[in-house]
Design a protein with these regions (language model features):
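Active-site phosphate-binding strand-loop segment of PLP-dependent enzymes
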Residues: 1-65, 70-72, 77
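PLP-dependent aminotransferase class I/II
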Residues: 2-6, 11, 15-17, 24, ...
Length: 253
């Protein structure tokens, strides 16, 4: 078992509270810092608080190797064990000998080289995203019904990988009253050239209709946006899995 806190959209999680629970019950922490490269808590980089930290170098992240990511290890011994399993768990024989199940998680030298080059501009990328947040803060300061998600205190230092807003449930976008229903009925999904169409709206944990209305309204003005992640326990594929929730994620969605 493990605790996996997430730096959602770059925002640091409540490090002190999570670590206190982990220490009390002896549960290892594996940080999901996929979106948190460059974010800090009390001046310390995310991904370095837990036993392991996970970074993503996907094409849309703060820096990229075109795909893949990195695992932050606590020491050399842990790194050697991880690399053993990441390179197919091949034993030290002149032929292929496998006594344990391994995986092919190696990153090519070409992708790694791209990542090394990206490191030279990492600070500039973080600064640019923070500048974008400053711009949104200025533009939204007098807009009623919209709250920009910002650092809750000086201890938090988000990279603002993506900027997020919370909409007042009473907010209405003129002319977009049926945006959600219309979008779902015409939506397509998939990847790699394989697509499928949605048939109807989901009845379980539908997003606030204002969210889709705002997205469509912004799209008409050439501004890209998207809904918050759907709560994982509300994904149909996980419907039979146990979940301990308090309603916050559903209300935000």
């Amino acid at each position: 078992k493990a605790i996996v806190p997430v730096a959602l959209y770059g925002m640091p999680y409540k490090v002190d509270e999570i670590m206190a629970v982990a220490d009390r019950y002896g549960i290892p922490v594996i940080e999901d810092a996929a979106e948190g490269f460059g974010s800090r808590y009390d001046g310390r980089m995310l991904g370095t608080f837990g036993k392991y930290g996970v970074l993503s170098f996907n094409g849309n992240k703060m820096i990229t190797t075109s795909g893949g990511g990195a695992l932050i290890c606590p020491d050399g011994e842990a790194k050697r064990e991880i690399m053993f399993y990441a390179t197919q768990a091949r034993e030290a024989y002149p032929y292929y000998q496998h006594e344990r199940i391994g995986y092919n998680y190696r990153m090519s030298n070409i992708c790694a080289g791209i990542g090394r080059g990206q490191m030279t501009v990492a600070d500039a990328h973080v600064a640019h995203h923070k500048h974008t947040c400053d711009l949104y803060r200025e533009l939204l300061k007098d807009v009623r019904g919209i709250t920009l998600h910002e650092n809750p205190s000086g201890r938090f230092d988000s990279n603002y990988w993506l900027n997020t807003i919370v909409l007042d449930p009473l907010l209405r976008v003129k002319g977009q009253e049926n945006a959600y229903q219309a979008t779902v009925q015409g939506a397509v999904g998939g990847a790699g050239g394989v697509t499928h169409a949605a048939v109807n709206a989901h009845t379980d944990c539908e997003p606030n209709a204002n969210v889709e209305a705002m997205r469509v309204g912004l799209d008409a003005m050439g501004i890209e946006s998207r809904p918050l992640w759907k709560p994982m326990h509300k994904q149909p594929v996980y419907k039979d899995c146990p979940a301990y929730v308090n309603g916050v994620s559903e209300s935000l969605f």
